[in-house]
Amino acid sequence: MTESLWHERRLTEEKKRRNDHRSPYQRDRARILHSAAFRRLQAKTQVLGVGMNDFYRTRLTHSLEVSQIGTGIRAQLKQKRPEFDHLFDSMSLIESLCLAHDIGHPPFGHGGEVALNYMMRDHGGFEGNGQTFRILTGLEPYTEYYGMNLCRRTLLGILKYPAPYSSLYRASGNKPVNNIRQLKPSQWTPVKGIFDDDSGILDWVLEPLNGSDRERFLSHRDLGANKHLRTQFKSLDCSVMELADDIAYAVHDLEDAIVMGIVTPSQWQQDVASKLTLSHDAWIKEEFTNIGQNLFSHQHHLRKDAIGTLVNGFVTAIDIVEDRAFTDPLLRFNAGLDTSFSEALEVLKQFVYKYVIRKPEIQMLEYKGQQIVMELFEAFESDPERLLPTHTQERWRESHTKGLNSHRVIADYISGMTDEFAARLHQHLFNPKAGSMIELNGEL
C-alpha cells in the first residue's frame, strides 16, 4: 500500500497556515463538517418526514450517529485484531466517511431520489451515493473546480458502488408515464453507481490499484431480469462506514418508530423476537429476544439501555474478513459482521421497512415529495435561463455551450435543496396565492 498516493489530492495544495499540524484526514473531516452540503442535512428527511415530530432523526443526526458507531467499530477492531491496525489510518478518516455518506441525498428521501432518477432517465440517471461523490469532488465550493479536494483514500472510502452508471444500467422495458402523478418508484429504481459525467474522477481515485485489482473492484453481479447490475466490492474503510450506516438505520430508526407509536410490542414479538429465537447464536437468543420489554418501556432510561445493547451487540460482532483475490490491502481486507448477527440485523431492517417505511402515511409524504421534485424539474427544464438562480444559470449555460450534460446541472440544484426549501419553492412557482420569491433568493 503506497500511503503517499492515497494521501494525494487532485489539486495540489500549498496552504501555509500557522502551526497547523493536522493529518490529511483531519483536514478532510473539517472540510466536510463545515460544508453547506453537510449543514443542509439537518432539514432533509431520514425516514420520518421533517416536521412530523420533534424527536425524529434527520439526515444530519443520522450521520452523526453513524460516525459514532463507525469510530466504535474502528476502536473494537483495533482491540480485537491488533495485527491489522497498520491498515487503518487516522480515526478522522472513518469519521469523514460516516459524516459525508448521505451528503448527496436529495430532499424527501427515496421519493426525491426516484423522482430525479426518472427526470434524468435519458441523461445519466440520478442516485444519492453518486451525488455524494459528485458533491465531494466537484460541487461543494471549497475550491473552484475540485469540490472539497479530499484525499484519494477518503474518496475511495465513500465509493459504496464503485462503477460507472453505463456499465451497470439495464433497461427495464418500462415506458415513460403520461402523467408524472402515475409514476411508480418500483419501476424506476436508480442505478447504484457513479455518474458517467464523473467517471474521469473515478479513474483518478483508482490509479494506485494494479490492473487485476481494478478490474475486479469494478466488476458487477446480475440481480435478475430487468434489474440493474450491482457492484460487488468495496474498500476496507467503506466496509466500516457501511456497517455503521446499516446498524444506525436498523436500530435508531426503530427507536424513532417505537417512541412515536408507529410499531407495537405485538408486532415486535411476531416479526422480530419469534425469528431471533431461531438464531444459532446463544447471545442473540438470550439478549435480543428478551429485549422487547425494555425497548417498548415508557421509562426512557430502559429504552435507551436496550438500544445501547442492540448497537453494542452488532459492533462487537464485527471482525476482519479477507478476500485473497485482491492484492491491495485496502481491498483485500474488509470489516464483516458475524453471520448470525448479520441475519439478526437483516431481521431488524426488514421490520423497519415493513412497519415504518411502507406505512401508508409515510408513503404519502414520500409521494408528495416525489411530485414536488418532478414538477420543479419540469419547470426548470422548460426554461433554464429564465427560472434557474443566476449562479446555476451560469453553470447550465457553460455546460450547454460545451455540449456537456446540462440536465445534470438542474439535478444538482434540486438535489441540494432541503425538504422545506423545495416545498416553499414549489408553492411560489405553482400556487397563485403564494407570496414573493424575494425571501428565497439567498437560501441556495
From Swiss-Prot:
Signal peptide: none annotated. Pfam families: HD, HD_assoc. Residues 59-250 form the HD domain. Residues 1-26 are annotated as: Disordered. GO terms for biological process: dGTP catabolic process. GO terms for molecular function: dGTPase activity. This is Deoxyguanosinetriphosphate triphosphohydrolase-like protein. It comes from Shewanella sediminis (strain HAW-EB3).
